Amino acid sequence: MNNIKNMRDIIDFAAKNYGDNIAFKYKINKNEVDEKSYNDLKNDSEAVSNALKSLNMIGKHVAIVGQTSYPWIVSYFGVVNSGGVIVPIDVQLPADDICELIERSDAEILIYDEIRHDVAERIKEKSHNVKYIISMNEKLNTEFALSLNELMAENRSSFHIEIDEEKLCTILFTSGTTG
């Protein structure tokens, strides 16, 4: 445990020591609960990292807006563990504010869930910086976004890159920076 220097080391340690133990348990709907193990977390976050690599987006800024969920968590880890900069944005902000923060952060990717489809549509129409829009939803409800699930399925393999612990990995906008 003394060799933990970054987020990836934490996930690797947990997968090695707790493997198939439950890391997350969450409701899918009123009657259905899903579970994810520490191995799932490692494999899924590495699939996100590989998806970024396949899009030539390693090290880029990635905005994420949506309710906290398992796809949100693996996206977060997949970005920071691939040397990128994650920009989590408050899902409850007005769409105009979210779009402004995405532009100010220099994000080249937007990952969103259906609750903020309005933001994805605006970014598609108005952003000059965002190159990819990725939906965290099980079912893709638009033609302009890529599916996170499909990207992960297509990019299942281990991922490793040297991480500079001194490099920026997260941009957090607080109420003081958002108005």
Q: What are these language model-derived features?
A:
Residues 35-39, 169-179:
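Conserved AMP-binding A3 loop
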Residues 81-150:
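Structural core segment of the AMP-binding/adenylate-forming
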